[in-house]
Each structure stands twice: as C-alpha cells, then as structure tokens.
C-alpha cells in the first residue's frame, strides 16, 4: 500500500505492507545465510522530508538532510529506510536505499494524481466522463519517468559498495501544469475562474466546465513543495534522466486514450472490464 491518502484510512495495513515486509525480507536473507551474496534495494521516498524551519536546507535536500515524515505511509517508509541501513551496518549486507522523487508511467496506479489526470482527460476526450475533480492544484512535484528511475535503481546495484542515493530530475512542476499539458494532448485549451476551493476550469471553445476543486481529496498533512539534490547520483552513477515531464505526460495520455477505446469495444461485446486499483 503506497498511497498517502489511503494510509490515513488504513495506517496499520500500510505499516504491515511497507516497513514490516522490508524487515521480513532483510531478516529472511540473514537467516538463509545469503546476506553476503544477495543485494537488497529498498525504494524510499522523497516525502520523508517536510519544509520546516529546523530542517530547511540552505539550497536543496540531500541524502543526509533531517527527516520529518507527515503521513502514516511516510512514517512506514522512514522505518523501512533505517532498518535497511541498520542491516547493512550490522551484518555487512549490500543493502541500499533509493530516495526517489515521483516517477510515473502509463502503468501508474489509477489512484495517483498524474494517472488520475491522464485517465480523466482521455475519458473526457472520448465522451466517457464529464469532469475531473482535484484538490491542491498548486502543489509542486519533481515528476520523472519510471524508465529513468529504474535505470538509476539498477546502477545503484552495480556498485562495489552499497550507498543511498537521491534520485530526482531537478525540475519541479505544479499539478496545474500537468492538467494543462494533458488537455493540450487532446487539443483542448482550458481557462480557469476563481481561486482556491471555488476554482473551476473551462474549455475555452465551449465554456464547458471540465475541472473542479473537490475537498474530498484534501490531505490532513500535505507536502506542497520540495527541492532535491541528486548530484551524488549524477557524479557517482553517471545517471542523467532522458525523458522530460512533457514526454511522460504525452505518453500517458496517449496510452489511456488507447486503453479506453479498446475497453469500449470490449464493453460493446459484453466483456467485463476490471479496473486497476491499489489497496
């Protein structure tokens, strides 16, 4: 379970699937006697950090910055990260953490904001949905393509010594930007009216309302903006992202349009369609 909003509703299940299973895997390697021959990678999260006075960096957050998780999911990931470090130091294991910024692709779970946006835009384009509902349109994220991030994970496991690395693109964009780009892929230009909880977005040609702010998607503790320094990965792993966020957005919208077109054909022939949701 890796969804932040869901973790507030299911904190115990989140802890069990995130930090307890990390511990179980590490302990299984130790008990089986393969800790010297197997390499262990733990996918950590950039949102272990929160922009507070005591841990605010001079420029960017990095691998050594103080952590302040703000959700049950992030708390679970903090434990997973530190138990990985503990097993590395205690048992001389090759165990490393990748502190990753948001990485997206057409196979992203449907409950995450980027996929929710591209799915809604695809459905609106195909006349299968009326509106897209969101909350914090001004939240900023450093979105990268999953292909680039998996390459970074692989590179981390090719090193002689296990080390933790921050992985980011150094480019931040707002949810608002991502909505704009997604609609541009289906030739819809949108304009917004009002602000905050009353904000609505309209198709400039038809003035039909396509996007609304909805308080149901409010998070009790939101991370609005983070800056990450991935220079260590670029220097030691020679890792540089190849895909831009616009490339990724274009790919995701095109993939969802194709997916829903195929689903409509199947539905018209009485086939049941299974949706993809993460618990």
Residue ranges and their predicted role:
Residues 110-279:
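C-terminal substrate-binding subdomain of Rossmann-fold SDR/epimerase-dehydratase oxidoreductases
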Residues 13, 102-105, 139-140, 217:
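Short histidine/acidic/glycine/proline-rich micro-motifs that form metal-
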Residues 30, 39, 70, 77, ...:
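Basic side chains
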Residues 1-103, 147, 153, 157, ...:
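N-terminal Rossmann-like NAD(P)+-binding domain of SDR-like oxidoreductases, especially those catalyzing
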Residues 50-52, 106-108, 174-176:
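A short beta-to-alpha transition loop/helix N-cap that caps and shapes the active-site region
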């Amino acid at each position: 379970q890796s969804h932040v909003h869901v973790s507030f509703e299911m904190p115990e299940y989140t802890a069990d699937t995130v930090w307890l299973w990390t511990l179980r895997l590490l302990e299984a390697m130790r008990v089986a006697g393969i800790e010297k021959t197997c390499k262990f990678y733990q996918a950590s999260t950039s949102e272990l950090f929160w922009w507070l006075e005591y841990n605010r960096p001079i420029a960017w957050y990095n691998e050594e910055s103080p952590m302040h998780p703000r959700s049950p999911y992030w708390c679970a990931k903090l434990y997973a990260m530190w138990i990985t470090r503990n097993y590395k130091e205690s048992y001389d294991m090759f165990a490393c953490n990748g502190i990753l910024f948001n990485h997206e692709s057409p196979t992203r779970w449907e409950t995450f904001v980027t996929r929710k946006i591209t799915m809604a835009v695809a459905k609106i384009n195909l006349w299968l949905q009326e509106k897209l509902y969101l909350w914090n349109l001004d939240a900023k994220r450093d979105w990268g393509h999953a292909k680039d991030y998996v390459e970074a994970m692989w590179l981390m496991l090719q090193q002689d010594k296990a080390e933790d690395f921050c992985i980011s693109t150094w480019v931040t964009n707002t949810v608002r930007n991502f909505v704009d780009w997604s609609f541009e892929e289906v030739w819809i230009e949108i304009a917004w009216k009002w602000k905050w909880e009353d904000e609505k977005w309209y198709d400039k040609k038809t003035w039909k309302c396509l996007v609304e702010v909805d308080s149901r998607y409010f998070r009790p503790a939101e991370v609005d903006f983070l800056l990450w320094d991935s220079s260590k990965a670029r220097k030691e792993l020679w890792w540089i992202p190849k895909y831009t966020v616009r490339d990724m957005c274009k790919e995701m919208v095109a993939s969802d349009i194709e997916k829903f077109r195929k689903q409509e054909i199947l539905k018209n022939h009485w086939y049941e369609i299974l949706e993809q949701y993460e618990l």
